[in-house]
């Protein structure tokens, strides 16, 4: 699942991004309302987490512009203001939930998962499949041929990225930015090691191989015709 966090306070933003990633989510973060609108209209997200008070555009204006543009992505508001009028305003503008700061990460995660299950006005994708490899996005589980595959959070995020873009060759730089949130360094072998470990888990025990190396270009997940 891919989430967008719009939070201008650095400490809170980093805390949210790290906590959500450790829970297995793919997370992008912006610090202004203007960037939140641009990202949400140009990228596919399963959920937006918006701070109400942000520079540029506030959270109210962000959701107003998104809904006007026909973007129905679920929205969870974060705010330090606990007034009934504020909660009502957010919900009337099209927000799906409202959480008051300070909050416990466990409560935030519970609300995020509830919104993803509910799907709001979207049909949220809850599973991915290629060949006999299946991924349950809500339970964060992977199976192949009915056999459970144990994955770390990073391995799951890598597999989810490859499955969402199956048939595409993904470069090391793209994988590094999407899964590790870092710029690719040619001196590090973190991507190769992660791919090797993932391949050992999803391919080594099976005749049909799904994870392919495209030399000089990157990696691709595809159920290629053996014939």
Swiss-Prot record:
- GO molecular function terms noted in the UniProt entry: phosphorelay response regulator activity; transcription cis-regulatory region binding
> Its domain of life?
Bacteria
One of its GO biological process terms is: regulation of DNA-templated transcription
List residues of the Response regulatory domain.
2-116
In this entry, the residue ranges of the DNA-binding region are 125-223
Q: What does this protein do?
A: Member of the two-component regulatory system CopS/CopR. Involved in the activation of copper resistance gene operon CopABCD. Phosphorylation of CopR by CopS would convert it into an active state to induce expression of the cop operon by binding to a specific site on the cop operon promoter (cop box) and possibly by facilitating the binding of RNA polymerase to the cop promoter. CopR also binds to the chromosomally encoded cop operon promoter. May also be involved in basic copper metabolism.
What protein name applies here? Transcriptional activator protein CopR
Q: Which species expresses this protein natively? A: Pseudomonas syringae pv. tomato
- Name the gene that codes for it: copR
